[in-house]
């Protein structure tokens, strides 16, 4: 039997895993469909994918992962830098300004001194 609330429930879209370092503890942050703005958590900062860190090289609004579905219904992840001060790197290659990079589950990307791994919805940490 179909649940009338099914359309309002969130579909798992994967997560980002912030790897522990001297600036912060390990954090797992769920992603949602659409733009997921990633950056340093600060009270009053309205971004939707913030993590707690004291890393000064992570901007408050550092980068964005857009989650959508392709024509086959598979999740698609597109990463872009938000004109950050230190850049966004995918496997040690900087994403140039105004460019986007398609990434997939297991991709390692770096913002400031912080390494992050994209995980698909069916993967465990």
Where would I find each of the regions flagged by the language model?
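Forkhead-associated
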Residues: 62-108
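Intrinsically disordered, low-complexity acidic Ser/Thr-rich regulatory segments
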Residues: 1-56, 66-76, 120-125
């Amino acid at each position: 039997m179909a649940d009338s609330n099914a359309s309002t429930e969130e579909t798992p879209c994967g997560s980002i895993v912030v790897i522990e370092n001297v600036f912060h503890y390990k954090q797992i942050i769920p992603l949602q469909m659409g733009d997921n703005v990633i950056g340093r958590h600060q009270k009053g900062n309205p971004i939707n994918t913030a993590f707690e860190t004291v890393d000064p090289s992570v901007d408050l609004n550092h980068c964005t992962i857009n989650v959508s579905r392709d024509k086959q219904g598979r999740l698609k992840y597109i990463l872009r830098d938000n004109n950050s001060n230190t850049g966004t790197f995918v496997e040690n290659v900087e994403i140039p300004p105004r460019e986007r990079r398609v990434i997939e589950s297991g991709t390692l990307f770096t913002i400031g001194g912080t390494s992050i791994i994209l995980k698909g919805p069916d993967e465990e940490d």
